[in-house]
């Protein structure tokens, strides 16, 4: 898991790249005994027990990520409900997570199984490009999803100005930027042939950097582009969102307190031509429960992303900026698994979607004939929930003997809702 210190230095450690940012990546199952004197090319040995652990963890992550995100895509495709902008972002974030599974985790899994890269030079470059492309896509799709929630909460009027077109442009920009920013991988990585300690020839997919600053510049740039900058943007957006929600809640609380001394009839709303008029705060000043729910969901996704990827990038930066850092000192199961679990983020997201959007799980279950009993239970629960909402609506209607006068003021910042009542 080391980096080359010169233009053609070979890594003094491991070679199977589950670290897509590093030279040879991170098959940390390479034993320290495989190192030659003075950091010479490694011998052709590795810790097989640790290698088996890596393969097992990667295989589990791959299967869970593919099944989870495929289920979300199937549910979104089969849902009878009208799709929203949030569904569009969830669909593309699931596609980005599938890209992580197939372009990053799967090559790493195959590489750990074969130990050495077994393929031509062009395949080495393509694999390295797709590995980083998946990382960029997953991060940037999360950024545009959070930006959409920021616009919906803090600038609701803009959601009325071709929101679908803007959302698609944001998603297309995320995919395009991810592809472009990962193109340098083609020029950095290549298949390099070297001689191991026992005198035999071997080849692997490694990077070539300009000494002495090339490695640091590369890893710092990748860490900033994939992790640091997106996290700053995400934090800024959520700072504004939280402030806007806090201000909205405070305004509603003050409004209720100011109306506390008024009669129930006046608080409920006056009559006008047989209609019960109930003022409701305009969408400019109010935040719906649906928006709050999607904000909560996005916040949990962002938190999972930060928790999963932070150890990975900390070790990356530590390895290139600490001159005393030695990979063989940290090649143990705990360090290896911590870094491997970075891709666990792609496994978590589907379950977060289904937790916050219950109908996705219901629609997914209904897609499988073997799960009809579970689907019927979901349908019953959904019907009971609808009945409770209708009962609550009926109980909250104002009495027909409410009194008051109706006045339509064009200067009012409140919209008017008319509810027909019997007289």
Swiss-Prot record:
UniProt keywords (A-Z) are: Cell membrane, Disulfide bond, G-protein coupled receptor, Glycoprotein, Lipoprotein, Membrane, Palmitate, Phosphoprotein, Receptor, Transducer, Transmembrane, Transmembrane helix
Q: Which cysteines are joined by disulfide bonds?
A: 124-205
What is its subcellular localisation?
Cell membrane
The portions of this protein that span the membrane are 53-76, 89-110, 126-147, 169-190, 221-241, 299-318, 337-356
Q: Which GO terms describe its molecular function?
A: peptide hormone binding; V1A vasopressin receptor binding; vasopressin receptor activity
- The positions flagged as glycosylation sites are 27, 198
Positions of region (Disordered): 1-23, 382-423
Q: Which residues lie on this side of the membrane: Cytoplasmic?
A: 77-88, 148-168, 242-298, 357-423
Feature: compositional bias, Polar residues: 388-406
* Gene Ontology, cellular component aspect: endocytic vesicle; endosome; plasma membrane
Cited SMART domains: DUF1856
Record flagged with keyword Transmembrane helix: yes
Similarity section:
Belongs to the G-protein coupled receptor 1 family. Vasopressin/oxytocin receptor subfamily.
Extra info from the record?
Knockout mice display deficits in individual discrimination. Male mice lacking functional AVPR1A (V1aRKO) exhibit markedly reduced anxiety-like behavior and a profound impairment in social recognition. V1aRKO performed normally on spatial and non-social olfactory learning and memory tasks.
Name it: Vasopressin V1a receptor
* Source species of the chain: Mus musculus (Mouse)
């Amino acid at each position: 898991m080391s980096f080359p210190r010169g233009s053609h230095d070979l890594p003094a450690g491991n070679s199977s790249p589950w670290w897509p940012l590093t030279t040879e990546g991170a098959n940390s199952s390479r034993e320290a005994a495989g190192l030659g004197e003075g950091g010479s090319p490694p011998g052709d040995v590795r810790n097989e027990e640790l290698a088996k652990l890596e393969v097992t963890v990667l295989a589990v992550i791959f299967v869970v990520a593919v099944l989870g995100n495929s289920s979300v895509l199937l549910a979104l495709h089969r849902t009878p409900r009208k799709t929203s902008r949030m569904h569009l972002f969830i669909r593309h974030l699931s596609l980005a997570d599938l890209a992580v599974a197939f372009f990053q985790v799967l090559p790493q899994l195959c590489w750990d199984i074969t130990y050495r890269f077994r393929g031509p030079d062009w395949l080495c470059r393509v694999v390295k490009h797709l590995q980083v492309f998946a990382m960029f896509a997953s991060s940037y799709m999360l950024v545009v999803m959070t930006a959409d929630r920021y616009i919906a909460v803090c600038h609701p009027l803009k959601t009325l100005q071709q929101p679908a077109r803007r959302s698609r442009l944001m998603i297309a920009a995320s995919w395009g930027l991810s592809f472009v920013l990962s193109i340098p991988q083609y020029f950095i990585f290549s298949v390099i042939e070297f001689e191991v300690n026992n005198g035999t020839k071997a080849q692997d997919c490694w990077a070539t950097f300009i000494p002495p600053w090339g490695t640091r510049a590369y890893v710092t740039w990748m860490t900033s582009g994939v992790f640091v900058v997106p996290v700053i943007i995400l934090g800024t957006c959520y700072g504004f969102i939280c402030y806007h929600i806090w201000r909205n809640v405070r305004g509603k609380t003050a409004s209720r307190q100011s109306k506390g001394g008024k009669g129930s009839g006046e608080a409920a709303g006056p009559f006008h031509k047989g209609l019960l008029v109930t003022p409701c705060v305009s969408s400019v000043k109010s935040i719906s429960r649906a928006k709050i729910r999607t904000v909560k969901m996005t916040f949990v996704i962002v938190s999972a992303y930060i928790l999963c990827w932070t150890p990975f990038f900390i070790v990356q930066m530590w390895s290139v900026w600490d001159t005393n850092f030695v990979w063989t000192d940290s090649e143990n199961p705990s360090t290896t698994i911590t870094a491997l679990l970075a891709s666990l983020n792609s496994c978590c997201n589907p379950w977060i979607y289904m937790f916050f959007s219950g109908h996705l799980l219901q629609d997914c279950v209904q897609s499988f004939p073997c799960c009809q009993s579970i689907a019927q239970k979901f349908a019953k629960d959904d019907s009971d929930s609808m009945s409770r909402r209708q009962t609550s609506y009926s109980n909250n209607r104002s009495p027909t003997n409410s009194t008051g006068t109706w006045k339509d003021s064009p200067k009012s910042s409140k919209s008017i809702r008319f509810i027909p009542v019997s007289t």
